[in-house]
Amino acid sequence: MVKDFSSQHPLGDVSPSQYKSEVRNLSFYYGSFLALKNINMMLHEKKVTALIGPSGCGKSTFLRCFNRMHDLYPGNRYMGDIILHPDNVNILSRSVDPIEVRMRISMVFQKPNPFPKSIYENVAYGLRVRGVRRRAILDEKVEDALRGAALWDEVKDRLHQLAYNLSGGQQQRLCIARALATDPEILLFDEPTSALDPIATASIEELIADLKDKVTILIVTHNMQQAARVSDYTAYMYLGEVIEFGVTDTIFIKPKNKQTEDYITGRFG
């Protein structure tokens, strides 16, 4: 029987207020393949943390541990903990409902993936799953989410049109609004601008800068310039391990690890 977050007992010591999440000795297996190796890292409250590294290094695998996406496929397994504060809950525990995890930790994928529904229903979907039925509440939450994604002024007069009618950049902002509608505590971005043009990319980056005042953000990007622009903290990953983690300016200007420096400067990648 799964338990609600509110039923969980505190795990470990109380976290300092600046941390939203702690990753403790996290390893992850795709079947018998070890994809992540003993990762330890903090996510700072209401800051942007970027994951960088070459293709296949484990960035997206790590990101998807946070909202239990790997649970959808048999044979995958976690070892270690991801602690969500202030509850001190290990969200990888089998006693924690993954649906509840995904309500608290939302995700925006690489390519815009609107549902085959209206703009309004795309944003309202998660709210309806949570049991919200009153139209006035739905209307308010949908508007708030669309405003939060800087999309309201562009769609307020066509909320009941199909989301597929929006441009690529608008569709991605709609997906962000859908993620915001349930008031998540952490927002995950997996290469959110890789399928967008430079103008739409700049719009999403500005939005991320605005959102960090409200929510903790973890972003995977292959674009190191983007990581430098949008993030407060950066983790460099290689072969399933976090090689170096720290303040973004330090990682990009004066990294401590030579392997990090080689990747940042283009000598390795």
From Swiss-Prot:
<keyword id="KW-1003">Cell membrane</keyword>
<dbReference type="GO" id="GO:0035435">
    <property type="term" value="P:phosphate ion transmembrane transport"/>
</dbReference>
<keyword id="KW-0067">ATP-binding</keyword>
<dbReference type="GO" id="GO:0015415">
    <property type="term" value="F:ATPase-coupled phosphate ion transmembrane transporter activity"/>
</dbReference>
<dbReference type="InterPro" id="IPR027417">
    <property type="entry name" value="P-loop_NTPase"/>
</dbReference>
<dbReference type="GO" id="GO:0016887">
    <property type="term" value="F:ATP hydrolysis activity"/>
</dbReference>
<dbReference type="GO" id="GO:0005524">
    <property type="term" value="F:ATP binding"/>
</dbReference>
<dbReference type="InterPro" id="IPR003439">
    <property type="entry name" value="ABC_transporter-like_ATP-bd"/>
</dbReference>
<comment type="function">
    <text>Part of the ABC transporter complex PstSACB involved in phosphate import. Responsible for energy coupling to the transport system.</text>
</comment>
<dbReference type="Pfam" id="PF00005">
    <property type="entry name" value="ABC_tran"/>
</dbReference>
<keyword id="KW-0997">Cell inner membrane</keyword>
<keyword id="KW-0813">Transport</keyword>
<comment type="similarity">
    <text>Belongs to the ABC transporter superfamily. Phosphate importer (TC 3.A.1.7) family.</text>
</comment>
<feature type="domain" description="ABC transporter">
    <location>
        <begin position="21"/>
        <end position="264"/>
    </location>
</feature>
<keyword id="KW-1278">Translocase</keyword>
<dbReference type="InterPro" id="IPR017871">
    <property type="entry name" value="ABC_transporter-like_CS"/>
</dbReference>
<dbReference type="GO" id="GO:0005886">
    <property type="term" value="C:plasma membrane"/>
</dbReference>
<feature type="binding site">
    <location>
        <begin position="53"/>
        <end position="60"/>
    </location>
    <ligand>
        <name>ATP</name>
    </ligand>
</feature>
<keyword id="KW-0547">Nucleotide-binding</keyword>
<protein>
    <recommendedName>
        <fullName>Phosphate import ATP-binding protein PstB</fullName>
        <ecNumber>7.3.2.1</ecNumber>
    </recommendedName>
</protein>
<comment type="subunit">
    <text>The complex is composed of two ATP-binding proteins (PstB), two transmembrane proteins (PstC and PstA) and a solute-binding protein (PstS).</text>
</comment>
<dbReference type="InterPro" id="IPR005670">
    <property type="entry name" value="PstB-like"/>
</dbReference>
<keyword id="KW-0472">Membrane</keyword>
<keyword id="KW-0592">Phosphate transport</keyword>
<dbReference type="InterPro" id="IPR003593">
    <property type="entry name" value="AAA+_ATPase"/>
</dbReference>
